[in-house]
Amino acid sequence: METMLAARLHVPSRTLRVEEVPRPQPGPGEVLVKVEAAGVCLSDVHLIDGTLKPFLLRGDTVTLGHEVSGTIAEVGEGVTIRTPGQRVVLYAGELRDGVTYTRGVDYDGGWAEYALSAATAMAPLPDSIPFDQGAIIPDAVSTPWGAITETAAVRPAEAAGVWGVGGLGVHAVQVLRAVGACPIVAVDPNPVARERALAAGADIALDPADPGLREAVAAVTGGAGLAAAFDFAGVPAVREQAVSVLAPKGRLVLVGLTDQPLTLTDGTRFSYLQQRVLGHYGSDMPVALPKLLRLVQAGRLDFSGSISGTLPLGRAAEAVARLEKKEGDPIRLILRP
């Protein structure tokens, strides 16, 4: 039996270990992908600390990693749309019997030398896009894309705000710029993140502790407020602040994960202004991923600055710790088997 290395999370004990496991074999309709790059995401941190739980996992241990790119090593019976050697980026999840299963959460992901996938749950990766940049698109980019284009349905010239300009938020700024949002307001307590937001295309970057934040948002929006606000931080105080600068009929989209209660201090004002709170998770992979790959290939979006470091698979725990502690203010760390 052939084996491989994989970073496995034992969910009950929250223990992450790099182990030698059997190399999977592709069944009918499946392909085996030799992993070239796998992103490390805050969702992985949340899985390890217990904030995020795998509700559909069979068993108690899972190979992490939902941001994965590589080359096809083998194809299973009946697969005609993929060929060995083809460069691909995997969807962050698969639809099974009408239910979406998340890769690296509900079934084994890509923190491994090889990853198994349905042949339909991937997209060709153009030669012009490096594996590391391609790997992060299925979550770090497509999640903001879905939040902006689908959940909030942002239109050109609408004012938008992004709270938390980290691994997803900085890409939200880029996507908002691409879809024509104007102005774009970035909010983050970290001065490095604020500078990063301005470089990504934000019109103004503010500290949430600034007592003049509401006045600054009013000034940049001509007194109208934000048509759409995005919480990528998952912090209750962020939501209160974002609602306070929403325009009438404005949308607050919750992207950052938290187990804290959702509270609106002034419910009467919220209802009177016909504002909305919308939850968001993931994206429509078959629709979003090809579009994003085209935008990157055409130079409309550029994620070369999003790769903050690359580590070998054996140092997966170190990568998680660096992201959790925000050492060096990383956007995305990449594991390479």
Label the model's feature ranges.
Residues Y91-T120:
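Cysteine-cluster motifs in flexible loop/terminal segments that predominantly coordinate metals
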Residues D203, V235-L301, P337:
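Glycine-rich phosphate-binding loop and adjacent beta-alpha segment
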Residues R87, D127-D210, E215:
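Mid-domain Rossmann-like dinucleotide-binding core that forms the NAD(H)/NADP(H) cofactor-binding site
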Residues E67-S69, Q86-R87, Y114, A159, ...:
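Residue-level marker of beta-strand positions
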Residues P22-A38, L52-E94, P126-I129:
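Glycine-rich beta-strand-centered segment in the early N-terminal region that forms part
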Residues M1-M4, E240-V243, L289-P337:
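C-terminal hydrophobic helical "lid"/dimerization subdomain
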